[in-house]
Amino acid sequence: MARGCLQGVKYLMFAFNLLFWLGGCGVLGVGIWLAATQGNFATLSSSFPSLSAANLLIVTGTFVMAIGFVGCIGALKENKCLLLTFFVLLLLVFLLEATIAVLFFAYSDKIDSYAQQDLKKGLHLYGTQGNVGLTNAWSIIQTDFRCCGVSNYTDWFEVYNATRVPDSCCLEFSDSCGLHEPGTWWKSPCYETVKAWLQENLLAVGIFGLCTALVQILGLTFAMTMYCQVVKADTYCA
């Protein structure tokens, strides 16, 4: 009976971790594709230049693949050490995500202030050598969200030391349109515009976060259940 339960949990554990590993492969693949085709796309922070979409996806994908691999081998080999390692790693990830979420909501005002200051510092790197990712990211954000600057289009005046903005701030794009009158530029601040967009899509973000948490809890349950079954089977055989 104990052996039959163990086999059932074993196959469920293996299937779960195989999907987990394949998901990591997909995330890693997207990260590598972004790095190869878009450079350091979406690098907006001057304090953390390596914090790009591509790098985040590559690190996340690699870590998920590693955890999934440990889980798969642990399930196939019915290895208590690997199963416990998988459980501990996944539990640490879950606790880290929960801690980050709590801190984010607890210090949202301070994070807002710091983020705006850091983004304004990053504006000074716009268009400079070695900062193609930051330049592309700002151009895309200002064009797609129809905004200009972090808190105001005048943020760019300090960057250029002139009454000028990037061409991506223009209502109607044309070469050197950023040198025209302010009436031809977008007036909405990018930080508040993007923040409002995220708040409008908060339900989707919440559902994604909830699904992620449920998957992790499922993985923890499978791992601990199988670990206990392996211990019982070993005791029964002894």
From Swiss-Prot:
One of its GO terms (biological process) is regulation of mitochondrial membrane potential. Residues 35-55, 107-201 are extracellular. The chain crosses the membrane at residues 14-34, 56-76, 86-106, 202-222. Residues 1-13, 77-85, 223-238 are cytoplasmic. Gene3D superfamilies: Tetraspanin (1.10.1450.10). Glycans are attached at N152, N161. Keywords: Glycoprotein, Membrane, Transmembrane, Transmembrane helix. SUPFAM superfamilies: Tetraspanin. It is found in: Membrane. It is a multi-pass membrane protein. It holds the Pfam family Tetraspanin. Its main location: membrane. CDD domains: NET-5_like_LEL (cd03165). One of its GO terms (cellular component) is membrane. PANTHER family: TETRASPANIN, TETRASPANIN-4. Forms a complex with integrins. Belongs to the tetraspanin (TM4SF) family. This is Tetraspanin-4. It comes from Mus musculus.
